[in-house]
Amino acid sequence: MRFVIVGGGPAGNTAATYAARLGARVTIVERDVIGGAAHLWDCIPSKTMIATGGAMSFARRIHGMGLEQANPEVDVEGLISRIEGIKSHLQKSTTTLLESQGVQLIRGVARFTGPNALTVETAEGTEELGFDCALVSTGSKPRVPDWCFPDGDRILTTRDCYPPKTFPESVTVVGSGVTGVEFVHMFSSFGAAVTLVVSRQQVLPGKDPEVAAVLEEDFLARGVRLLKGARATSIERTVDDEHGDHVVISCDDGRTVRSSHAVLAIGSVPNTESLGLEAAGVEVDAGGYVPINQHCVTNQPHIYAAGDVSGKLPLSSVAAMQGRKVAEHVMGLHTREHRHLDYDKAASAIFTEPEIADVGLAEAEAFAVGRKIRVTKVPFSATPKALINNDSRGFVKIISDPATGVVLGGSIVGRHAAELISVIALAVTANLKVSDIVESLLVHPALAEALVDAAE
């Protein structure tokens, strides 16, 4: 079985290692970086900076723990070194794993030339590859509207921010979704004056209003300015005697914002425009995404798509799971007992302060379809470990079926929410009941005790 994978991110890498272990002859073609550009150039650097910013934020609160007040400052060179060190370690470990499985790695730009062939433009020339099955997992890139022209210096896409060439004294973030609020948290933690342009009446418009309210409260406490009900229509760089080199963001309601930097965080677009998918007969939708079925198969039965290009949840965890499912399908394991990937049960997290995480059925979704649910909510202020940590913000909310007690979903806002949500995610995936959580003997004192309290 000749299996060619275009794109070496989480989906491609996972598909490659699983398929190679099952006996396939696997080749990965990667244009940018083994490990994935969105993963190693976006996700990992942003979370590294958020962790550093979180450490600074925590240091400012230690006076509440019987310690002297601390006021740490950013060591930009040290931060850059830390980011590059983590990226290098992850890239090397991924490359080593793939090579140990016998996966062939080709650095170059792939383009399909037919239903079973593609060419790769490398530094040495053009190489032709034939395949029995192929996976398109080329990821995505930041979306840039036609009214904005990022320069990588003052007007930034998310990929320009790790860290920016000049550290911002003030920054305006355009976009109040997951990525946007993470940048607000990150730059405000570093001491920048932050403005967030919010097109709706709450941040995180797709999330539970109670969740958004906790985050907004934290933003306002940090001095973040929220421009609600405004859509940015232009971002221009200018220089004057009063403000020096800065940017001006204009909104559709006439409001303007001046800041040293602006960050576009308005989503991403798939990397499919130059792959030659039409030559392979692969259909692409109006947004550039590749439609797939439950096995990640495109309209061509031997060509798969996974990760951001598939138009499903843009999460590394989802991409990696898709990659494993693709490998199993390529090698025929789907004919055995097989669990399809259920995107509705994927856990997700937002690395703000406090952290936000959710999984499964949301309260608003249940109400929209008239489904009866049981909602229980416990604040972390009732949990001893939260008080010990000097951080009692947030809550745990569990949604269950009132008739059966089966856990349907949940939300957590608070410290380590991204870790704690795994308990609810496991319950949702395994169809456990709230009584299963209640009967679990957990550690005391621990934040996880709030899960038991909420389940009761």
Segment roles from a protein language model:
Residues 1-3:
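Extreme N-terminal starter segment of soluble prokaryotic enzymes
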Residues 6-32, 37, 44, 48-55, ...:
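Flexible, glycine-rich terminal cap/loop adjacent to redox cofactors
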Residues 12, 177-180, 319:
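Catalytic nucleophile loop
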Residues 17-24, 29-167, 200-204, 209-211, ...:
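Glycine-rich flavin
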Residues 43, 138-197, 278-280, 284-295, ...:
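Glycine-rich dinucleotide-binding loop and its adjacent helix/turn
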Residues 70, 104-107, 111-122, 129, ...:
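A Rossmann-like FAD-binding core segment of flavoenzymes
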Residues 152-167, 256-335:
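FAD-site-proximal beta/loop scaffold in flavoenzymes
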